[in-house]
Amino acid sequence: MTWLKSGASSLLFVALLLLVSLPRPLCAGEALVGGQYLSAAGQDIQLLVTVSSPAPSTLIVIQNLPPGTVIDAASPAFNQYDAGKGEVKWLLTHVNPGRYTVSLRLQRPVVSGGISGDIRYKDPGSGRMINLRVRP
């Protein structure tokens, strides 16, 4: 009878282990969007944005630079730049799951730690606005 109890316990343990290790769908707002700097100092700034499914339809990407920074080039083209505040904004529409790189070429280099970013989006499941802070 003891072997039945230990066998049942082992079977239950294996069943629970399998259940926990199965891939699960994302909950609303959980890890839908991520951001990581590929380059955060010098003249070339690159922010990698990763979007999971279900993708929000629109992303607002905000890059904070030192005030007065001169931008030589941007890819994609930004929608707004307030040089006095050092705030660059992109509105990315028709977003699909995948990776997006936002790049800036600056006239003068910025020091490490001199920038930060935000990614804003509406969670498709809950309808809440999410603000993701990105730091180098």
Language-model-detected regions and their locations in the chain:
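A surface/secretory-pathway sequence property marking extracellular, secreted
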Residues: 56-60, 64-95, 99-101
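Low-complexity, intrinsically disordered segments enriched in Ser/Thr together with acidic residues
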Residues: 94-114, 121
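N-terminal secretory signal peptides that target proteins for export/translocation
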Residues: 1-5
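Exposed beta-strand and adjacent loop surfaces of beta-rich binding modules
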Residues: 56-62, 114-116, 129
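Short beta-strand elements of extracellular/lumenal beta-sandwich folds
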Residues: 36-56
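Bacterial N-terminal signal peptides
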Residues: 10-21
